[in-house]
Amino acid sequence: MLRDRPSPTDPAVLALQALAHVAGDDAMGPRFLALTGMDADALRAKAGKPETLIALLDYLMANEHDLVATAEAIGVTPEQLAMAARKLGPDMGGNDW
């Protein structure tokens, strides 16, 4: 039986791609860690958890420059990341913009 592959526009997939970009960025990575109170090991351990993805999208929604830079880096529009935040947010306890 073939398993369904997640769509590249799936909100969790977009959030994971954004997280990978932010974590690897010299400016955004440390700032995100400082705001969440996590260290790099904790982030690695919690990377796929809904609350971590929501925290990352909340972080990006609060900083337009980082939102635009991240969207460009992962090949999506800022609006697609905002939509991912809206889709993950209400169901998982995040913001509903």
Predicted features and spans:
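Metal- and O2-centered redox machinery and metal/ROS homeostasis
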Residues: 1-97
